[in-house]
Design a protein with these regions (language model features):
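Polar, S/T/G-rich
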Residues: 2-10, 18-300, 394-400
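Surface-exposed, non-catalytic interaction/assembly patches
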Residues: 40-91, 285-286, 320-389, 466, ...
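Short, glycine/acidic-rich hinge or "gate" loops at secondary-structure transitions
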Residues: 41-45, 248-253, 310-324, 428-430, ...
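A generic structural motif
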Residues: 128, 135, 147-148, 318-319, ...
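Mobile, glycine-rich extracellular loop/lid and propeptide segments
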Residues: 280-285, 289-326, 434
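Acidic, low-complexity/disordered segments
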Residues: 338, 432-491
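Long hydrophobic segments that form regular secondary structure
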Residues: 366-458
Length: 491
């Protein structure tokens, strides 16, 4: 098994398709579905979860987890009586119903078009200037008094909190709007949403003849605190009935806690300026496109923390299997193995040795960046062709975490044995995702480790029940901490 794969390069790029099935299903007669990597054509409408979406009757409202930039979804618009002012209502994100959840806006990181917004210090809804990214920056104050952004959050019960201004029925309920179009004082509560009301005053000189895209910077932590931990995000999404799976009572919270604990462990990396630093192994930062199937979104979340999802029919619970270093939970040898041991290897033409990972970079308003990694030439098999995998980590906004996950993927690809065994019936107690060991003199194996990928009940030659297991080669070195250097975007 090789050491860490450390060659990494960064690019700016467009979108690459990614598919990863990260589920394991474990019944009394046990089945497991493993990850399958490769291109997957979209099977649902791309509703543009991070974009400012035009009005449509099939728009879905996204969910922010962690820290993210995104646009809003138009849900209402009103023209003033004098036809000089437009009011727009944008739904930005759903909010967790968990009592400890927190949602906030960082108004110092809002953008109008591609320019940074500065708000007035007295009227907190009033935009007083726009600043571009030039050096030195250009500040445009013509916008002052022409653009207002009022922010709100609403609980699941419909209790609205004004973040930086007046209540909606005050901000969008003045005499300049026809009475029938004003925001009512009750009955329009935007339950469970973060939303904004934008007031735009027409002025050709200020460039406010039409609304440009607004990019909001939001923070949503389903269990409170200052970060979104993977176990908390998974549990929230699996149990929420509005935007998630709605499976309250059917998920294993213990496995979510275990994932949080593993994710909180620190890894060491080299900052862009040199030296040494540490950060938590895994965090979730991204936007859920609720127009896509729930399982697709769960897979994308778990891909960013190198885990699987499992179902156990005996307990009736969905749980998380963490892909990490484990000790053997069951031993197979001549005393409990029945019949042949079937061994195969992954086709050399399908074994990845290059990986290109796209992720939304927190250094550039979540615009896509790439990290590219290769298996060192000395670790390739003779005549092994270049085989690149392209993948997207939608809930990773950090180059260090992206490299860490990419290194694991390349190292895991070096472990290419696939083994099928039949055992006596006690082997049925092995669960999907467990690590087991095999001792067999013919193959020269002494306590050789494998990860269990499928378990099924089988009838053996003597008519008794046994267990058939499909295994993949396991090596704990896959889970070492690679040498990683943080990426800094070019100025």
């Amino acid at each position: 098994m090789p050491g860490s794969i450390i060659a990494a390069y960064f690019f700016t790029a467009g979108t690459f398709a990614f598919y990863a099935t990260a589920a394991a299903i474990n019944f009394a007669v046990s089945f497991v579905v493993t990850r399958v990597f490769g291109s997957k054509p979209p099977n649902s409408q791309d509703t543009g979860a991070r974009q400012q979406v035009p009005p449509a009757n099939n728009n879905s409202i996204p969910v922010v987890y962690g820290d993210a930039w995104l646009g809003g979804v138009f849900v209402d618009a009103v023209l003033s009586i004098d036809q000089k002012t437009m009011y727009y209502v944008l739904a930005i994100s759903s909010i967790s119903t968990d009592a400890s959840a927190s949602f906030s806006f960082d108004r110092q990181k809002f953008y109008y078009g591609d320019r940074l917004i500065t708000f007035d210090t007295t009227d907190l809804t009033k935009v007083v200037s726009l600043t571009d990214g030039a050096s030195p920056p250009n500040v445009d104050d013509k916008i002052s008094g022409k653009l207002y952004i009022s922010l709100y959050t609403s609980t699941n019960a419909g209790v609205i909190t004004a973040v930086n201004g007046t209540a909606p029925h005050v901000f969008m309920g003045g005499a300049d709007i026809a009475a029938a179009l004003r925001w009512p004082s009750s009955g329009r509560q935007m339950n469970g949403l973060a939303f904004a009301i934008v007031k735009l005053v027409y002025n050709a000189d200020a460039g406010t003849t039409g609304l440009q895209p607004i990019t909001f910077y939001c923070k949503h932590y389903p269990k409170g605190g200052t970060v979104a931990k993977p176990g908390d995000v998974w549990y929230d999404y699996m149990t929420d009935a509005r935007y998630g799976a709605g499976m309250t009572g059917l998920v294993d919270s213990t496995s979510a806690t275990a994932l949080n604990t593993y994710s909180d462990q620190t890894i060491t990396y080299t900052p862009a300026g040199g030296g040494s630093a540490t950060q938590a192994r895994y965090r979730i930062n991204g936007v859920v496109d609720t127009g896509k199937p729930v399982l697709d979104n769960v897979e994308k979340m778990l891909e960013c923390c190198d885990s699987w999802m499992a179902y156990n029919a005996a307990s009736g619970l969905w749980s998380i299997v963490i892909n990490k270093a484990e000790t053997s939970s069951f031993s197979f040898n001549d005393t409990n193995l029945i019949g042949e041991i079937r061994v195969s290897a992954i086709d050399i033409n399908q074994q990845i040795n290059q990986i290109q990972i796209e992720f939304p970079s927190k250094l550039n308003r979540d615009q896509p960046d790439l990290v590219y990694m290769e298996t060192p030439a000395g670790l390739l098999y003779p005549n092994e062709p270049a085989n690149r995998q392209t993948t997207t980590l939608e809930f990773t906004n950090d180059s260090v975490q992206a490299q860490y996950l990419g290194n694991r993927r390349l190292e895991q690809a070096r472990e290419d044995l696939i083994v099928t065994i039949t055992s006596t019936y006690p082997g049925i107690q092995v669960d999907a995702g467990d690590v087991v060991d095999i001792t067999n003199a013919d193959y020269g194996w002494t306590n050789k480790l494998f990860r269990v990928m499928k378990v099924s009940e089988a009838t053996v030659d003597d008519g008794n029940l046994g267990a058939t297991l499909e295994l993949s080669e396991y090596n704990a070195v896959v889970y070492d901490d690679a040498t990683i250097t943080a990426f800094t975007a070019a100025p």
